[in-house]
Regions:
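Structural core segment of the AMP-binding/adenylate-forming
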Residues: 77, 81-144, 201-232
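Conserved short alpha-helical elements in the N-terminal third of ANL/AMP-binding
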Residues: 78-82, 183-197
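Conserved AMP-binding/adenylate-forming core of the ANL superfamily
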Residues: 22-56, 143-166
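Conserved AMP-binding
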Residues: 65-69, 176-180
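A short N-terminal helical cap/helix-turn-helix that marks the beginning
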Residues: 2-22
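Cytochrome P450 catalytic-core helices
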Residues: 67-77
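Gly/Thr-rich phosphate-binding loop signature of adenosyl cofactor/nucleotide-binding cores
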Residues: 62
Length: 232
């Protein structure tokens, strides 16, 4: 049975260097393009950090409180690679959060992501918060020994790819606020279909027509764009 980790591995074999996820933040001006190979490297480092340094275990529920972002995709794929279970509900286990809202009461560990361009560090991490950007680059580039989870999500991804009309080579524009609850649609279904994603946070609607042309967008999820095929 497929799992999210195997979907990423298939993307690496299919097109290792082409864009897998292109991220825009129109408030900060950031544009980050991540290939399948680069994504796999980030996922491996993050999985090693989570398992070896923060003691995340197979079947452990981990709260992922992150917005639409390329690093959100990395964290989710890393957790599935370990065999952990991403959840949107904070618990007494590890909590993964963005810079705002730190710390989280009752958490065993808090891993803080600044979500700044160039994997910037947290400006002033509170005591007890592990700064993702400060730790992840030192983690090993290869992850071994996990018991991948997310098989049900991967199975759903193949079905959703068909329902959304995604095909190999599609460039999917995502402009709505998305996160863990929508991960099958914006992350796993494109992986299953062999498509790639243009993920826009704080999208400036005036910039979308030019961006659609620049990124060769072929289909949109959420906000309609004139001249571009909607999903479904």
């Amino acid at each position: 049975m497929p799992d999210p980790a195997s979907l990423l591995a298939a993307a690496c074999r299919r097109d290792p260097a082409g864009p897998l996820l292109t991220f825009y933040d129109d408030e900060t001006g950031e544009r980050t393009e991540v290939s399948a190979t680069t994504a796999a490297n980030w996922v491996a480092k993050t999985a090693n950090l989570l398992r070896d340094d923060l003691d995340v275990e197979v079947d452990e529920a981990v709260a992922v409180l992150l917005p639409a972002h390329w690093q959100t995709a990395v964290v989710l794929l890393a957790l599935w690679s370990i065999g952990a279970v991403p959840t949107a509900t904070p618990a007494d286990g590890l909590v993964v959060v963005a810079g705002a809202g730190l710390p989280v009461a009752g958490a065993r560990e808090v891993l803080g992501l600044s979500l700044l361009p160039m994997n910037g560090r947290l400006p002033h991490p509170p005591a007890g918060v592990v700064d993702y950007a400060a730790e992840v680059l030192a983690a090993p580039d290869v992850f071994v020994g996990g018991e991948p989870s997310g098989q049900v999500d991967a199975e759903r991804a193949y079905r959703r790819a068909g329902e959304l009309g995604l095909a190999a080579g599609d460039r999917l524009l995502v402009t709505d606020a998305v996160g863990l609850a929508d991960a099958v649609d914006w992350l796993l279904a494109p992986l299953a279909a062999g498509a790639s994603v243009v993920l826009c946070r704080h999208a400036d609607l005036k910039r979308l027509p030019a961006r659609v042309a620049q990124e060769r967008v072929s289909v949109t999820l959420g906000r309609p764009v004139s001249g571009v095929r909607p999903t479904g």
